[in-house]
């Protein structure tokens, strides 16, 4: 549910003045917007740290620390026996950031083409009444993403297979992308629903990272779990350039 931070950020941006007033009353002096953001972010970070304080490693990982096996060596992933699996794990996650980084984040560029509008004054007015602001599209997609993450975990338990659930999500992304770009036009609520569903079908991040790490031995699982998501996020640059 970490993605809900983006939802919280939307409400902070929308009601920033109100929150600034509350914080200013507490500390007795007026704050700039960036100072409010620092305080809110710092408090949330400390709360997250407290919630993680009770976590512990399994005995499997604890036993690995007492062996002489190399641990956390990133370059081990480039061995012939590992590189194909490692690249495949990265590719599986790229559609998530294609949806979030392109379809949702650049929705303000898609709406004129989706709605078949031009730059005329009349069409600009229509665009304002039918399109959804990008921050709100992000909010709805992240609510969907959090919901999808929960459902994908439950479905993987039900099917006893993460692979099947990931296949379902990838097919869902393909279908919803076509509906979003080439489907019928609708009202703002229709596009809010589309943003939510796009987020829901990309909600396999947790099982994607878990699946990636479990392809490798315990000595490099933490390295895989840390680097695969970062390469996927970095892939947004190539995706947007290619798009």
Per-segment meaning from a language model:
Residues 148-161:
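Helix-to-loop junctions at the C-terminal end of transmembrane segments
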Residues 107, 203-216:
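Intracellular juxtamembrane helix-capping segments at the cytosolic ends
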Residues 32-51:
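Symmetry-related core transmembrane helices of the 12-TM Major Facilitator Superfamily/SLC fold
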Residues 164-179:
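Structural signature of the two symmetry-related core transmembrane helices
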Residues 53-74:
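Flexible cytoplasmic inter-helical loops of multi-pass small-molecule transporters
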Residues 1-20, 44, 226-240:
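Glycine-rich segments within core transmembrane alpha-helices of 12-TM secondary carriers
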Residues 82-148, 236-241:
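Extracytoplasmic gate region of multi-pass secondary transporters
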Residues 143, 213, 218-243:
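A late C-terminal transmembrane helix in Major Facilitator Superfamily
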